[in-house]
Curated annotation (Swiss-Prot):
Protein name: Large ribosomal subunit protein uL11
Signal peptide (UniProt feature, chain positions): none
Presence of the UniProt keyword rRNA-binding in the record: yes
GO molecular function annotation: large ribosomal subunit rRNA binding; structural constituent of ribosome
Pfam families listed in its UniProt record: Ribosomal_L11, Ribosomal_L11_N
Gene name linked to the record: rpl11
Assembly description: Part of the ribosomal stalk of the 50S ribosomal subunit. Interacts with L10 and the large rRNA to form the base of the stalk. L10 forms an elongated spine to which L12 dimers bind in a sequential fashion forming a multimeric L10(L12)X complex.
One GO location term (cellular component): large ribosomal subunit
Coiled-coil regions listed in the entry: none
InterPro entries: Ribosomal_uL11, Ribosomal_uL11_C, Ribosomal_uL11_C_sf, Ribosomal_uL11_N, Ribosomal_uL11_N_sf
The UniProt record lists the keyword RNA-binding: yes
Stated family: Belongs to the universal ribosomal protein uL11 family.
Length: 159
């Protein structure tokens, strides 16, 4: 029977310390090998918090499934800032609609949206919470523009 360990690790920088070591040690698997594989699989997400699922089949056999980082982490990376404002009236960054679409495409399978436009709308809402503007506009202004069809040409190109 396989054991499953789920953890949130720093992309490309996982260590044998908590949370991985204490969870994997009792299973008898080579923790160093698991950590090395996680770091290899998450190196492109360097420094971002990444959810991983480790499926330990035996002492020598394991699989690793890498999830997508939280939407907020992807947006903060796109904006080049470390944390959101915490206040919807203060803005910490500004990203382009293309960057919002990029994040929506990455997160698409994890969202409840039925199409790219509604996925983008969800991401725009998160931008507002973090204090990130889109093309110089607030999230509310962008939501109105989305609803009126102002950005539809961008979604037609992606279909």
């Amino acid at each position: 029977m396989a054991n499953v360990v789920e953890a949130l690790v720093s992309g490309g920088k996982a260590t044998a310390g908590p949370p991985l070591g204490p969870a994997l040690g009792p299973l008898g698997v080579n923790v160093a090998a698991v950590v090395a594989k996680i770091n290899e699989l998450t190196k492109d997400l360097n420094g971002m918090q990444v959810p991983v699922k480790i499926i330990v089949k035996s002492r020598t056999e394991f699989e690793i499934e890498v999830g997508t980082p939280p939407t907020s982490a992807l947006l903060l990376k796109e904006a080049g800032v470390e944390k959101g404002s915490g206040d919807k009236k203060n803005f910490v960054g500004d990203i382009s609609m293309d960057q919002v679409i990029k994040v929506a495409e990455i997160k698409r399978k994890n969202l409840l949206s039925s199409n790219l436009k509604s996925a983008v709308s969800e991401i725009v809402g998160t931008c507002g919470t973090l204090g990130i503007k889109i093309d110089g506009l607030t999230s509310k202004e962008v939501q109105k523009a989305l609803a009126s069809g102002s950005y539809d040409h961008l979604f037609e190109a992606k279909s």
